[in-house]
Structures are given as structure tokens and as C-alpha cells.
């Protein structure tokens, strides 16, 4: 269906408050493209429109104006809804809200069962998906006994079992501790690299965003920045003016530069910082 997995054209979305009879503009004429196989992060603080944008990517919300295309399918066409949701799976913030069965493998099988997949193929899909997220040995466990990071990996396995082309993750690490966050990020990157599945990650964690192929920054319902992580985070002043932070090492480089140290602000990780400091005379 072409090289774009997701494409929005002049997208507008308004939340209507029926009690107060007023509208809130959540997305204001946003156009964006996400390539097949890309790992894109959408960054923004609360109320920026990033989660609303995510919900348009698997037709949980439909545009008030403009268009959203998923793998070439217009989400406004009611006949496309189920196919859109099959091609673009979604993982949410709270893992407990996404798990529906009392045994891990039954939970992962839930999606393909509802698609009417043959039982033998369901078995293969469940095993393959659990292996892909490193949770195969937990297949007979009860999901409620797992850690937050493990639960999110089960949620990702459940989406993988439906054989999507794209996974949209709406702040999947927001409720996790640092080790759980690392587990989930490792899984997301492996799914993207090994299987070529397009990943759209909504986050407010800068260290997660730094690992993406490309970043889109949203503010007040508009797309305000777009580029590779190095390009985005080197604009420290602009990022801070939007109310966001930059990765800690980038912040350190920025502060050193302000003090007259000859160092680039295009530093994203500790190894790069060590190399840059070692080269100073």
C-alpha cells in the first residue's frame, strides 16, 4: 500500500462537552507521515494532543476534519474500521486494563480467536509471540502475579499474535519502575528491528525518545517540531520553552557549553559524553 504506514492530512479533532455545550480543539490541522518499519516517537506534555493523535491511528477516534490513513485505508470509512484495527494494534498505559484471561497463553490467544483463526495456527502464533517478547516460560502463569513490565510484554505479545503491521503504544511505561521500563523498551526495539513492525511510541520520557528513528513534538494540539533525536534534542532552549526536558547527558552538555566548555549539545548518551570529554584539551 505504498511506503507510508500512517498518514494524516490536515487532521482536526474536537472534544465536545455536552454539559457545557462547548468544544475543545485537541488536534489542530496536523499533517504527518510514518514510514513502514519506522520507529517513531510522539513527544509532548499533558494536553499536547499526543494521545488523541495515537487513538486516531487505530480508529478509536475518528477525525472531526481532515483525514487519517492507516496502511492506505481511510479511517473515516466505516467499512475500513476492523481492517484498520487488525493492521494497527494498540497498547495502553495500564497493563491491568488490557489483560482479559486468567492464564498468560489464553490472554495472548484472545485476539486471534476473535479473528476466527484456525486453532492450530493460534497455537503457533501464541508461542511465537511469547518467544518474541521473552515471556514463553511464563505461558502457564496467571497474569495478575506478574510484574508491571512483564504484563506490558504480555500485552505486546497479544497484539503480535494478531499479526499487525503497526503497533501504537500510548505511554506504555508510565506506570512502571525503571527495570520494567527497560524491559518494555528492549521488547519494543526488538519487535521493530526483527519483524519490521512499525512502532509509534507516545511518551514523555526523553531517554526513551532518544532511541527512536524520528521524533515528532506536539504542543497545544499542533506539530511543532520534527526530526531525528539528535536534531531535536540539540535545540535545548526550544524544547524547554515547550515545557519538556532533554536527556540528562544532553542537559549536562548544554550547561557545560553555557559555561564556555567547547562541547556539542548533540550528545544523547553517556558513551558519547565520555568521548567528548576525553577529547577536550
UniProtKB/Swiss-Prot annotation:
Residues 6-245 form the ABC transporter domain. SUPFAM superfamilies: P-loop containing nucleoside triphosphate hydrolases (SSF52540). Pfam families: ABC_tran (PF00005). ATP binds at residues 44-51. It is an enzyme of class 7 (translocase). PROSITE patterns: ABC_TRANSPORTER_1, ABC_TRANSPORTER_2, CBIO. InterPro entries: AAA+_ATPase, ABC_transporter-like_ATP-bd, ABC_transporter-like_CS, ABC_transpr_CbiO/EcfA_su, ECF_ABC_transporter_ATP-bd, EcfA_1, P-loop_NTPase. It comes from the Bacteria. It is found in: Cell membrane. The keyword Translocase applies. Its EC number is 7.-.-.-. Keywords: ATP-binding, Cell membrane, Membrane, Nucleotide-binding, Translocase, Transport. Forms a stable energy-coupling factor (ECF) transporter complex composed of 2 membrane-embedded substrate-binding proteins (S component), 2 ATP-binding proteins (A component) and 2 transmembrane proteins (T component). Belongs to the ABC transporter superfamily. Energy-coupling factor EcfA family. This is Energy-coupling factor transporter ATP-binding protein EcfA1.
Amino acid at each position: 500500500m505504498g511506503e507510508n504506514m500512517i498518514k494524516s492530512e490536515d487532521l482536526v479533532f474536537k472534544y465536545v462537552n455536552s454539559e457545557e455545550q462547548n468544544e475543545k480543539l485537541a488536534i489542530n490541522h496536523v499533517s504527518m507521515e510514518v514510514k513502514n518499519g519506522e520507529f517513531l516517537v510522539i513527544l509532548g506534555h499533558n494536553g499536547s494532543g499526543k494521545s488523541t493523535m495515537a487513538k486516531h491511528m487505530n480508529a478509536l477516534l475518528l477525525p472531526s476534519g481532515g483525514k487519517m490513513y492507516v496502511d492506505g485505508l481511510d479511517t473515516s470509512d466505516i467499512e475500513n474500521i476492523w481492517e484498520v484495527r487488525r493492521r494497527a494494534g494498540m497498547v495502553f498505559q495500564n497493563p491491568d486494563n488490557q489483560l482479559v484471561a486468567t492464564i498468560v497463553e489464553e490472554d495472548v490467544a484472545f485476539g486471534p480467536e476473535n479473528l476466527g483463526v484456525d486453532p492450530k495456527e493460534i497455537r503457533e502464533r501464541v508461542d511465537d509471540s511469547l518467544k518474541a517478547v521473552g515471556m514463553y516460560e511464563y505461558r502457564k502463569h496467571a497474569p495478575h502475579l506478574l510484574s508491571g513490565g512483564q504484563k506490558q510484554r504480555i500485552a505486546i505479545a497479544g497484539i503480535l499474535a494478531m499479526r499487525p503491521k503497526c503497533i501504537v503504544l500510548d505511554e506504555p511505561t508510565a506506570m512502571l519502575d525503571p527495570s520494567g521500563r527497560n524491559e518494555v523498551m528492549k521488547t519494543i526495539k526488538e519487535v521493530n528491528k526483527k519483524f519490521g513492525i512499525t512502532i509509534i511510541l507516545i511518551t514523555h520520557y526523553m531517554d526513551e525518545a532518544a532511541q527512536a528513528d524520528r521524533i515528532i513534538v506536539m504542543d497545544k494540539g499542533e506539530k511543532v517540531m520534527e526530526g531525528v533525536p539528535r536534531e531535536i534534542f540539540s535545540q535545548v532552549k526550544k524544547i524547554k520553552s515547550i515545557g519538556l526536558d532533554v536527556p540528562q547527558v544532553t542537559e549536562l552538555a548544554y550547561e557545560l557549553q553555557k559555561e564556555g566548555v567547547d562541547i556539542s549539545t548533540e550528545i544523547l548518551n553517556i558513551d558519547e559524553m565520555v568521548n567528548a570529554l576525553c577529547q577536550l584539551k
